[in-house]
C-alpha cells in the first residue's frame, strides 16, 4: 500500500541511524496536550493492535496519508498537508507498507473522536442523543473521561462504539462522508526497506502562508 508521511530532519536521521522510526510517546504532541486526544489516540492504537500486534516498545502509531481530497496520487499535493511550520526542513517519504499492517480511516470523521463526539448516521439520532445527554446533565467530555461510575461508563462505551464508523472509508452516507474524502493511515513503524522516495520541503514564511490559502 502506497502512503505518504512527513517527518522532521531529526526523525530522518534517526531512521537512517536506527533503521526504523516509531512514535516517541513523550514527544507526541496531541495525546500529551489534551486528555480527549489521548483517549482518541489510544482508541486508534487499540484498533490497529487488533489487526497488527503492537510491539512492546511502542505506545502510539505513526500517521500517514493514503488519500487527499479523493486522490491517491499525492506526489504534487499542496505542501500544507506535510509542512507544520515555515523555514524548517520537512522530509516527505513515499512508503510501500504491507496493507495488513495498515489501518485506514476517514480523516474528517477522526475529528469527532478527537473532540469527543459520537458519530451518528443522521441528524435525528444526533439530536436525540444530545437531548439524552442534556436530560442526564452530562457533557460529552465528562462522559469520556469517566473511569468509575458504571452508568456513565455505559454512555462512554456507547459514544466510543460509534467511532468505528471512521474505518468505513467507502461509506456513502452524505450525512457522514464527503465525496472527495481524505483518508489517513496508521501503522506501528517505518523501516528503511519500505521507503520508496524522499523529498525535502522547506517553505518560506510567504510560501507557507500561501499554501494555507490554496
Give the role of each language-model region.
Residues 2, 10, 19-30, 58-60, ...:
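Conserved NAD+-utilizing ADP-ribose enzyme module
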Residues 3-6, 64-65:
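Short hydrophobic-aromatic micro-motifs
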Residues 7-14:
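Short polar catalytic/cofactor-binding loops
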Residues 14-66, 70-74:
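Glycine-rich loop/turn
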Amino acid at each position: 500500500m502506497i502512503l505518504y508521511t512527513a517527518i522532521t530532519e531529526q526523525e530522518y536521521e534517526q531512521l537512517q541511524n536506527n533503521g526504523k522510526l516509531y512514535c516517541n510517546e513523550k514527544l507526541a504532541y496531541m495525546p500529551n496536550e489534551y486528555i480527549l486526544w489521548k483517549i482518541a489516540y489510544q482508541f486508534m492504537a487499540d484498533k490497529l493492535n487488533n489487526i497488527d500486534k503492537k510491539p512492546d516498545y511502542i505506545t502510539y502509531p505513526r500517521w500517514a496519508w493514503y488519500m487527499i481530497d479523493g486522490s491517491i496520487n499525492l506526489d504534487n499535493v499542496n505542501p500544507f498537508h506535510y509542512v507544520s511550520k515555515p523555514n524548517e526542513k520537512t522530509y516527505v517519504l513515499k512508503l510501500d507498507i504491507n496493507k495488513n499492517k495498515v489501518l485506514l480511516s476517514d480523516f474528517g470523521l477522526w475529528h469527532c473522536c478527537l473532540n469527543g463526539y459520537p458519530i451518528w448516521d443522521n441528524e435525528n439520532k444526533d439530536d436525540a442523543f444530545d437531548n439524552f445527554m442534556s436530560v442526564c446533565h452530562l457533557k460529552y467530555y465528562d462522559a469520556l473521561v469517566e473511569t468509575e461510575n458504571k452508568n456513565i461508563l455505559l454512555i462512554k462505551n456507547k459514544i466510543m462504539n460509534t467511532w468505528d464508523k471512521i474505518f468505513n472509508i467507502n461509506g456513502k452516507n452524505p450525512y457522514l462522508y464527503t465525496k472527495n474524502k481524505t483518508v489517513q493511515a496508521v501503522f506501528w513503524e517505518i523501516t528503511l526497506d519500505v521507503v520508496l522516495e524522499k523529498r525535502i520541503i522547506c517553505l518560506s514564511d510567504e510560501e507557507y502562508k500561501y499554501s494555507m490559502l490554496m
